[in-house]
């Protein structure tokens, strides 16, 4: 019983809360982008036009951006679409900043508490690795997007060449599902005790 309490209170519960919070901030950012430019951004869940076989996000939503190069709609991936929205005067930079802040907390929690994963939940450890890799790329993108400090300007230093990002660095959606399942399993066990 004590081990389940520890797993829930130190890993699964906090992770679920952090992921849920990050997801809510992400959705508010989606709404802000839609209100800024509805011909470029849309949430298919709200339009009721989701096609069969489309992989929705863990909360059942599907946010898209119109890709002008491909002349078609595609799934919006924060890590891939960063430069087209961050620092572009769309009023969403604060949402991105907050998601990165929450990501720091998630990353630290994973690094400190991954040993509390339930033994039969090994797939979550793989998802943790994927998340940590994703977050390192996101963090680097965020750092490079910040204006140069006075010290950097005075020294003439630059933040380096733009980071090349691939789809593999996108947020691993499976992690939210696995954390939610684990949290629910532990809550059920604790309720019976």
Model-derived regions, located:
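Conserved non-transmembrane functional hotspots
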Residues: 1-193
